[in-house]
Swiss-Prot record:
Predominant location: cytoplasm
Record key words, sorted: Cytoplasm, NADP, Oxidoreductase, Queuosine biosynthesis
Organism of provenance: Helicobacter acinonychis (strain Sheeba)
Name of the protein described by the UniProt record: NADPH-dependent 7-cyano-7-deazaguanine reductase
UniProt-recorded Gene Ontology molecular function terms: preQ1 synthase activity
Amino acid sequence: MSSELNLKLLGTKTPYIFEYNKDLLEAFPNPNPNLDPLITLECKEFTSLCPITSQPDFGVVYIRYIPKDKMVESKSLKLYLFSYRNHGSFHESCINTILLDLVGLLEPKYLEVYGDFVSRGGIAIKPFVNYAIKEYQDFKEKRLLGAK
């Protein structure tokens, strides 16, 4: 079935890449494009490096989206998120890049990314960013107002 959907990673030996690589992301056709499910994906073991100190940063990344014609393949998403492991970038930049990469891949009706990072020096950073096509702008605004 993976070959029918043109998926390269699902069902194969996993090559773990720890340098940022958006080309790891894969999508498959949405089997129900007439429905509007809000899909939640959660990565509880997200890590990246502080671009100043090179110290590791840890957090949970939440991705919620309403698909249009394509859906993200979860193994490719896991490998993509793991590719941030040795990537030096601020939390906000990581979250923005994840959103842009997924929007570029999926062209969804709506997509949001929220990062809940472990505090450093007593400060917790929790960036939130969202995107919507024209017909979902009201939903986007309501979600933004309700962001944690």
